[in-house]
């Protein structure tokens, strides 16, 4: 049978045994990829600096997903939080990778078995002897089992009743750790940033799934609905399954890009909106103001800012700064962060404090403009020096550092002041090592960006797949020219439309 490449799946259309076999093989491939990718990432991951070189800076993709579900330790003796461990047990990064690979192998063998032994009694209709599946019943079974898994995850794993809990952090991604979460049953459970909503929603959705599954197992669909929605056709299952998958893909693309309790910034990096809104900058200034109110000096107040918080307030960690086709981790772009130089405070010769206007997300270059606290431009780095009025040299701008490695250091020579003014456009200033990885200095996106792009793209493609297969199954008789309710034996070639006596062909 010479099938074109896009029609090859028709070989399992009326063969339930081999349809099952190819799905088991698909599960083997997915699980095998996950385990293999985890082992590869563990081979290249450097856990030595969780503050300035976290997993998302190194381009880790599957390690964050394991971590948010409660895996924190490695057989290599390290912990994701930076400490050391002596007995991580089976539920370590390597243990999870190994279980996926073992499961993949078992699925591989099961797929071969079902491909060879395809003609099982369970797949044949005892009345007709032909292969058939009771699709509404199978739907009920799967819905029930999915409900049990969903309920179990929310009630046991997330709550810590029987499981580790999940990764929970503060709003600024500083204190994250794996902990048990109590379900949030009030209105706060609908806040996407409240971890308790994860537990309560899984419990509620799981309960609904169990009840719906039992309903579909005990109640048969009405005949008119069964025929109208083509419930006996396997392509109906394909179409509705694709719908479920593309809907889920759109949802997770949104929760990843805009941020939520399920995508902590410690594991996936900050969102672009935190840069756009000056989210971390405002928190840093709030902490400094509180320090000054407690009679700390400016230097002492800035020195109390956690390096982790300062690092979030750097444009190189904005996932929207990386081009879609720039391969590699963030570390391959601007380099590996080594240390925070400190916060630069600029002043003109009249003693006014000046603030460098920060670069918006979608700019690659941006004019260096320094404004005072009222937003009035007081200094800049001009494009044309001949017409400049506010140049650093003319205004006499100086810079002094507070906190970080350059704490207490000040510069007045224009070249150095301009250098740090340019770097201040990008947020807090860090020393970056570009030599180790031969980093090219061009920003890369974080796994947050890749995940969003991949899932949004595939969701769109799968949406079209849903429309395609849904139309094929609903209008199959129209496309084929055969009435599905036609019981009479028909002769191909007698009529222009098969089985329709009103279209009898004329003898030539």
From Swiss-Prot:
It is found in: Plastid, Chloroplast thylakoid membrane. GO terms for molecular function: chlorophyll binding; electron transporter, transferring electrons within the cyclic electron transport pathway of photosynthesis activity. One of its GO terms (biological process) is photosynthetic electron transport in photosystem II. It comes from the Eukaryota. Keywords: Chlorophyll, Chloroplast, Chromophore, Membrane, Photosynthesis, Photosystem II, Plastid, Thylakoid, Transmembrane, Transmembrane helix. The chain crosses the membrane at residues 21-36, 101-115, 140-156, 203-218, 237-252, 457-472. Its main location: plastid. Binds multiple chlorophylls. PSII binds additional chlorophylls, carotenoids and specific lipids. It holds the Pfam family PSII. One of its GO terms (cellular component) is photosystem II. It is a multi-pass membrane protein. Belongs to the PsbB/PsbC family. PsbB subfamily. PSII is composed of 1 copy each of membrane proteins PsbA, PsbB, PsbC, PsbD, PsbE, PsbF, PsbH, PsbI, PsbJ, PsbK, PsbL, PsbM, PsbT, PsbX, PsbY, PsbZ, Psb30/Ycf12, at least 3 peripheral proteins of the oxygen-evolving complex and a large number of cofactors. It forms dimeric complexes. PANTHER family: PHOTOSYSTEM II CP43 REACTION CENTER PROTEIN. NCBIfam families: PS_II_CP47. One of the components of the core complex of photosystem II (PSII). It binds chlorophyll and helps catalyze the primary light-induced photochemical processes of PSII. PSII is a light-driven water:plastoquinone oxidoreductase, using light energy to abstract electrons from H(2)O, generating O(2) and a proton gradient subsequently used for ATP formation. This is Photosystem II CP47 reaction center protein. It comes from Hordeum vulgare (Barley). The lineage of its organism: Eukaryota, Viridiplantae, Streptophyta, Embryophyta, Tracheophyta.
């Amino acid at each position: 049978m010479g099938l074109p490449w896009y029609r090859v799946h028709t070989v399992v259309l009326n063969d339930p045994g081999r349809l099952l076999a190819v799905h088991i093989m698909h599960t083997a491939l997915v699980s095998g990829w996950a385990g293999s990718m985890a082992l590869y990432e563990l081979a290249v991951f450097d856990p030595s600096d969780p503050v300035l070189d976290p997993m998302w800076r190194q381009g880790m993709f599957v390690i964050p997903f394991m971590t948010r579900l409660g895996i924190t330790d490695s057989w290599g003796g390290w912990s994701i939080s930076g400490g050391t461990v002596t007995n991580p047990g089976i539920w370590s990064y390597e243990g999870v990778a190994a279980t996926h690979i073992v499961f993949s192998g078992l699925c591989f063998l099961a797929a071969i078995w079902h491909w060879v032994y395809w003609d099982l009694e369970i797949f044949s209709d005892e009345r007709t002897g032909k292969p058939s599946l009771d699709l509404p019943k199978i739907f009920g079974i799967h819905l029930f089992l999915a409900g049990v898994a969903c309920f179990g995850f929310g009630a046991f794993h997330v709550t810590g009743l029987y499981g580790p809990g999940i990764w929970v952090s503060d709003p600024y991604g500083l204190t994250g750790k794996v902990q048990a979460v109590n379900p949030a049953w009030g209105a706060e459970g609908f806040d996407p940033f409240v971890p308790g909503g994860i537990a309560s929603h899984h419990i509620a959705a799981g309960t609904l799934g169990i009840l719906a599954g039992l309903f579909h197992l005990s109640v048969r669909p009405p005949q008119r609905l069964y025929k109208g929605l083509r419930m006996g056709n396997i392509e109906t299952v394909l179409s509705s399954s694709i719908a479920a998958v593309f809907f889920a893909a759109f949802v997770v693309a949104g929760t990843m890009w805009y941020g939520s309790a399920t995508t902590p910034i410690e594991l996936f990096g900050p969102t672009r909106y935190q840069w756009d809104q000056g989210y971390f900058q405002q928190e840093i200034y709030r902490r400094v103001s509180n320090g000054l109110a407690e009679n700390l000096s400016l230097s002492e107040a800035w020195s109390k800012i956690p390096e982790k918080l300062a690092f979030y307030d750097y444009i190189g960690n904005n996932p929207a700064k990386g081009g879609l086709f720039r391969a590699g981790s963030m570390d391959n772009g601007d380099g590996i962060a080594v240390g925070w130089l400190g916060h630069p405070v600029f002043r003109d010769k009249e003693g006014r404090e000046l603030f460098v206007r920060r670069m918006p997300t979608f700019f690659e270059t941006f004019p260096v403009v320094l404004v005072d606290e009222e937003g009035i431009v007081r200094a800049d780095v001009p494009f044309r020096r001949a017409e400049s009025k506010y140049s650093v040299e003319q205004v006499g701008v100086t810079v002094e550092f507070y906190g970080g490695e350059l704490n207490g250091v000040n510069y007045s020579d224009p070249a150095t002041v301009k250098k740090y003014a340019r770097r201040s456009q990008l947020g807090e200033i860090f020393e970056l090592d570009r030599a180790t990885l031969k980093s090219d200095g061009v920003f890369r996106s974080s796994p947050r960006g890749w995940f969003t792009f991949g899932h949004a793209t595939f969701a769109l493609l799968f949406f079209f797949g849903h429309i395609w297969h849904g139309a094929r199954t609903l209008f199959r008789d129209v496309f084929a020219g055969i009435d599905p309710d036609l019981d009479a034996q028909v002769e191909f070639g007698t009529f222009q439309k098969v089985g329709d006596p009103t279209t009898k062909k004329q003898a030539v």
